[in-house]
């Protein structure tokens, strides 16, 4: 099949799926970008900022993201499909293994890789493991040194050099950033000049801030330049492929992460039990929050039910904002001992709202 015939086929597929009101131009680009990094480096905040809509919940607590989350950015000249992924870590139980399979699936399916680090801190072995994990991939790779808004100006040179040293060939580690290659600046980027054999070897690296929006337009331009020519796969205005039940469950979990402390948030799962649109247009949602121990259930409910009410009230506002409708949210607390260690329960809790 010639290139022209392939383009025609792509357009026919997109039209059949109903993904556009008009044919996409011949120079239209589209593709998947896997967003990867260790936990708590701001991947979800960055994806939300790039998409321009909240498609993934955020929390300062690590391991907030448990599944691949698709964020769709549509422009006249391109459609970028960001795959927000769980933070890469050593799997110790069934939940962690599930999360790492989600990372591997995103890397397998993507057209480009965006490696995200937290430049406000010096890199550690977790960052190096992520770099090594993606080194074997043939797709174009980019480094986003994120959380630049939290970077102390006195630390810029040291921290940028340390993060770019993640990319240095093994034989040059310890010599400084890139073995003497030019460093990224706060205002711009640089093309990679690493020799063959680098651990990571990206096309570009850049300081970014998902919270403040630093350099996101430039980062996006770099990503777009490497994506293949192709059709629009989702209609304009659609920002994710996640359904409303999944999003509602995630908003409940986000508020639980926000208000609960210590180990309780890590053992939480949320399932939607009932969803009804009532004659007056109000949406009734019943959800169950699962924890692993009775003591955690008591903390989740709170004195006189205060904690559960607080989580519900804040989650309801997020759900109403997303749905554009009034919501009556009813929450229940239940105990499911050791669910994070049970493959079947992990799959049920993480996929049951899809």
List each language-model region with its residue ranges:
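Residue-level signature of catalytic and energy-coupling elements of molecular machines
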Residues: 36, 40, 46, 69, ...
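P-loop NTP-binding site
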Residues: 244-354
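G-domain G4 guanine-recognition motif of GTPases
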Residues: 85, 117-120, 142-156, 206-214, ...
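Conserved, well-folded catalytic cores of nucleic-acid-processing
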Residues: 53, 72-76, 91, 106-113, ...
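Canonical P-loop GTPase G-domain recognition
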Residues: 140, 149-186, 190-240
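Conserved glycine(s) of the Walker
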Residues: 42, 215, 307
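Conserved C-terminal guanine-recognition region of P-loop GTPase G domains, centered on the G4
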Residues: 77, 100-171, 200-204, 278-279
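Conserved G1/Walker A P-loop phosphate-binding module
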Residues: 2-101, 105-107
């Amino acid at each position: 099949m010639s290139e022209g015939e392939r383009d025609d086929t792509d357009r026919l597929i997109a039209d059949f799926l109903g993904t556009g009101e008009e044919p996409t131009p011949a120079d239209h680009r589209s593709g998947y970008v896997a967003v990867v990094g260790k936990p708590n480096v701001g991947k979800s905040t960055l994806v939300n900022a790039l998409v321009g809509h909240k498609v993934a919940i955020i929390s300062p607590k690590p391991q907030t993201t448990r599944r691949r989350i698709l964020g769709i950015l549509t422009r006249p000249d391109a459609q970028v499909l960001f795959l927000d992924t769980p933070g890469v870590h050593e799997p110790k139980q069934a939940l962690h293994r599930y999360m790492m399979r989600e990372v591997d699936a995103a890397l397998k399916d993507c057209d480009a890789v965006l490696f995200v680090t937290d430049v406000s801190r010096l890199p550690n072995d977790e960052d190096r493991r992520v770099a090594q994990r993606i080194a074997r991939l043939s797709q174009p790779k980019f480094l986003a040194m994120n959380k630049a808004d939290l970077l102390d100006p006195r630390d810029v040179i040291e921290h940028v050099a340390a993060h770019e040293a993640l990319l240095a060939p093994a034989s040059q580690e310890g010599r400084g950033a890139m073995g003497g290659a030019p460093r990224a600046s706060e205002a711009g980027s640089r093309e990679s000049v690493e020799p063959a054999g680098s651990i990571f070897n990206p096309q570009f690296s850049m300081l970014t801030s998902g919270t403040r929006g630093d350099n996101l337009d430039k980062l996006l331009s770099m990503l777009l330049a490497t994506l293949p020519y192709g059709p629009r796969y989702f209609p304009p205005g659609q920002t994710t492929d996640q359904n409303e039940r999944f999003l509602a469950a995630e908003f409940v979990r986000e508020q639980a992460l926000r208000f609960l402390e210590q180990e309780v948030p890590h053992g939480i799962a949320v399932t939607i039990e009932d969803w009804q649109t009532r004659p007056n247009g109000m949406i009734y949602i019943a959800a169950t929050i699962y924890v692993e121990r009775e003591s955690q259930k008591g903390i989740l409910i709170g004195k006189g039910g205060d904690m559960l009410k607080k989580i519900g009230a804040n989650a309801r506002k997020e759900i109403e904002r997303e749905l554009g409708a009034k919501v009556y949210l009813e929450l229940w607390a239940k105990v499911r001992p050791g669910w994070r260690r049970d493959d079947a329960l992990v799959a049920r809790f993480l996929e049951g709202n899809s």
